[in-house]
Amino acid sequence: MRRLIGLSLLALLAACSSDRPKPTPLEAITPQIAGRQVWSARIDGAAPGLIVTARDGEFTVAGADGSVLALQSDNGREVWRGNAGARLSAGIGSDGRHAAVVTRDNEVVLLERGAVKWRARLASRVSTAPLVAGERVFVMGVDRVVNAYDALDGRLLWTLQRPGDPLTLSQPGVVAAFKDTLLVGQGQRLTAVDPLRGSVRWEIALANPRGTNEVERLSDLTGPALRLGDVVCARSFQVGVGCANAQLGTLVWSRNVGGVQAIGGDADLVVGADASDRISAWRAGSGDLAWTSETLRYRGLSAPLVVGRTVIFGDTEGQVHFLDRADGKTLLRLPTDGSPVVAAPARAGNTILVVTKNGGLFAFRPE
């Protein structure tokens, strides 16, 4: 039987071994770019492992209480709202028409423009947001079992279950679409699956686990993954960051660097923070180190968003940091509600949405 380990337990283990240093005080800055909050909204606390989806000028988000809503990105106007009928364990996946979440009762729930269309019982807990793509809904449990459902009627199409490690991570993993292929994280391996049949096409390790016990060797890929054309990159929990050519099924590069949050980037740069919140930026094509920054160490950084000339992180005090992609220097800092930023900032058009643990939705627009 597989056992699960959550981030809270790992944090407790770390705290028992040594006291985590206090967050680095924020340095005084002179804003180098203009930016402002353009609208805000609120949900009843962010859903665990929340992934904000941005599509066709809309943000789709989910609250811990089961609420699911879509908002216009430019002005925050509510487009539709629904409810899964129970508190959530993971969300949200959306293709613009359908939205899927998973409840604490181990049910995947599909909504269409706010109306519940179907529910399906799952055999295990889920901490990764479902993927909705190609008229299918893909759900991966914390036991790494992958189920595919028909988006129209909830019919189970196939199940992928493979031998795995005795210990798995209860944290959002990788479930992503690449052309006609489903990509899922299986431990430290990026695995390509036929979305029609559930058969494995190829897999490749993005990192090499180290350590002398099960906890130290824990190396599940943490999501969401980063797609850069034919290349897909992801963090391997506490072990490294790697990129693979998903068209060829080959490793492009891998770097040993600790960390627990997902990475961000674009065609030129891949960015992530390690376990101490030291930020590193690598050249996307080669993996060569471009720069590092220690100005935000121990501030509990979110996964980043790279857009334009900026790298955007949220922190545990609700601050949103806009860093210069050239060298990591702070260009702008904007506040939210003081609670931790819990998901990577999301972009729709020229609007950036940040979600906090207390359920605050804050839309910013760099100018």
Regions found by a protein language model. Give the residues of each.
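Structural signature of WD-repeat beta-propellers
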Residues: 63-64, 103-104, 141-142, 185-187, ...
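Blade-level signature of beta-propeller repeat domains, shared across WD40, Kelch, NHL, RCC1
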Residues: 330, 335-367
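C-terminal motif of bacterial Sec signal peptides marking the signal peptidase cleavage site
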Residues: 12-15
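Short loop/turn segments that connect beta-strands within beta-propeller blades
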Residues: 72-75, 112-115, 150-153, 195-198, ...
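Loop/turn-rich, solvent-exposed surfaces of beta-rich toroidal or solenoidal domains
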Residues: 273-280, 288-322
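Extracytoplasmic beta-rich repeat domains
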Residues: 20-53, 80-96, 117-133, 156-179, ...
